[in-house]
Amino acid sequence: MASQGTKRSYEQMETGGERQNATEIRASVGRMVGGIGRFYIQMCTELKLSDYEGRLIQNSITIERMVLSAFDERRNKYLEEHPSAGKDPKKTGGPIYRRRDGKWIRELILYDKEEIRRIWRQANNGEDATAGLTHLMIWHSNLNDATYQRTRALVRTGMDPRMCSLMQGSTLPRRSGAAGAAVKGVGTMVMELIRMIKRGINDRNFWRGENGRRTRIAYERMCNILKGKFQTAAQRAMMDQVRESRNPGNAEIEDLIFLARSALILRGSVAHKSCLPACVYGLAVASGYDFEREGYSLVGIDPFRLLQNSQVFSLIRPNENPAHKSQLVWMACHSAAFEDLRVSSFIRGTRVVPRGQLSTRGVQIASNENMETMDSRTLELRSRYWAIRTRSGGNTNQQRASAGQISVQPTFSVQRKLPFERATIMAAFTGNTEGRTSDMRTEIIRMMESARPEDVSFQGRGVFELSDEKATNPIVPSFDMSNEGSYFFGDNAEEYDN
C-alpha cells in the first residue's frame, strides 16, 4: 500500500504534521476540529445566535465562509490593490438567518477580517491553524460535489461529461495545501493542468521570465500530484512525459485527456474524508467533549458517531423534500458524492437516490430568495452502519489496475463488484495511439481491455455496527450489481457557478 515510505497519512496532511504515530495523529486531528468548534461557539456568542439558530446549517456555512475569506491572503491583497465599488477589502460577512415571530429573517452582517482572524486564532491556541481552514474548505468542496454538476467545466476543457466521477474537489481553492491535493480527483487535476497549458498557448509570456519560472514549478508540482494518484506504471510514465515537456501544448492536452479517460477503469487513488459543518463540532465542544483528549479521525467511526448525536437544522424552500435535503448533506458530510448508491444506501440504512430524482436545490440560499415562505427542518444525518473511508480507487488484484465503474470513485472500503460498461469506455479510445506516448497508450488500453467487471474490489471489507468502534466484526453486504449505481444518473442538477 502506498502509505509506507514518504507518504503521509491524510490526517498528517490535514494537520501539517511530520510522521506521527496513530495516537499523535488522532490528537492533532482532534485539536484541529476542537479549534473549529471553539471558534464556532465564540462566533455564535458574538452574533447573539440562539441555540436553534446556531444549529442552522446555513448560518454555519456563512460563518465558515467568513473565516476562510478573512485568511485568504492572496485575495485580500488583490482586493486592496484593485479597489472595486462597494467592496470593503478589510471586511467580510454574509447572510445570518434569525427566527423572529415564527418566521425566518435574513440579516446581512459585516465584520472586520482582523476581528475574525483574532477570534479564530484565540480558539486555536493563538495559532493560524491552517489545517482547520483547509478542513472547512474540504467540507465546502464536498458539499459542492454533491450539489452541482460540472458538465460545462468538463466540456470547456475538452473532456467528456461522462467523466464527472473524476471531478472530486473541483471547486477547492488553490491554497488548500497537501490535504486538498489528496482529495482532488484525477479529472480535477487534469482540468487544472489543461487550463494552465491553454493559458501558455494563448499567452507567449506565460512560461517566461521570473513569473514563468514559478509557473513552471507549479506545473511540475501539479503533474507530480496527478502522477501520484495513478497506480499503474504506464499511466505514471505518461505523466512523466507531460511533466518534462519543454513547452506544453496540444500534445500534452491530448495525453491528459487520454489519461483522464483511462482513469474510468484504471482508477486513481483519491482520498475521502468526512468533514462536517463547523456547527457540528461546536455542538460537541459546547456539550463538554474534549476532542484533543479523546482523539479524532476523519476516516473512521468518529464522524459517524458525531452525526448520530447532533441535531442540525436547515432552511427548506416551499417545494423541497426535507428527506432529499438530508440526503444531500449526508453525502457531503461523508464525501460520498462519487460513491456507488447501493453502498451508500446500505451504510445509511435508507435508500439514497440519484441526483436526477432529488426534489431539492442547494443548501445555500441566494440573497434574492423570498424568506417569507422559508421553513426549517431537522436534517437526518444518522447512519445504520459505519465504514472506513478509502484512498484507493478500488482496483483489484493487489491494487494493480482492474475493473472500475464509469461513474464511481469509491468512498467506503466495502466489498463490491465495480460494474462498468467497458464498451462505452473503450469506444472513446479508438484511433490515436501514435506519437511519443504510443507504447504507453497501447499498454494502458491493453490493461483496460483485460479488466473484468466481475472482479471483486475491497475483498473481505465490510461495514460495522455503530457499537463496534474497533472494527472487529465486518459485515460484508451483498449487492445486486447488475445495474448502474451512479449518483449522477439522469442528472439535472444546476451547474456550479462561482
UniProtKB/Swiss-Prot annotation:
Function: Encapsidates the negative strand viral RNA, protecting it from nucleases. The encapsidated genomic RNA is termed the ribonucleoprotein (RNP) and serves as template for transcription and replication. The RNP needs to be localized in the host nucleus to start an infectious cycle, but is too large to diffuse through the nuclear pore complex. NP comprises at least 2 nuclear localization signals that are responsible for the active RNP import into the nucleus through cellular importin alpha/beta pathway.
Location(s), subcellular: Virion; Host nucleus
Superkingdom of the organism of origin: Viruses
Annotated Gene Ontology cellular component terms: helical viral capsid; host cell; host cell nucleus; ribonucleoprotein complex; viral nucleocapsid
HAMAP family (UniProt xref): INFV_NCAP
Residue span of region Disordered: 1-21
Residue ranges the record marks as coiled coil: none
GO molecular function: RNA binding; structural molecule activity
Family: Belongs to the influenza viruses nucleoprotein family.
Biological process terms in GO annotation: symbiont entry into host cell; viral penetration into host nucleus
Organism: Influenza A virus (strain A/Anas acuta/Primorje/695/1976 H2N3)
Pfam families to which the protein is assigned, alphabetical: Flu_NP
Segments carrying motif Unconventional nuclear localization signal: 1-18
Subunit (UniProt): Homomultimerizes to form the nucleocapsid. May bind host exportin-1/XPO1. Binds to viral genomic RNA. Protein-RNA contacts are mediated by a combination of electrostatic interactions between positively charged residues and the phosphate backbone and planar interactions between aromatic side chains and bases.
Post-translational modification remark: Late in virus-infected cells, may be cleaved from a 56-kDa protein to a 53-kDa protein by a cellular caspase. This cleavage might be a marker for the onset of apoptosis in infected cells or have a specific function in virus host interaction.
Keywords: Capsid protein, Helical capsid protein, Host nucleus, Host-virus interaction, Ribonucleoprotein, RNA-binding, Viral nucleoprotein, Viral penetration into host nucleus, Virion, Virus entry into host cell
Motif Bipartite nuclear localization signal positions after renumbering to this chain: 198-216
The protein's name: Nucleoprotein
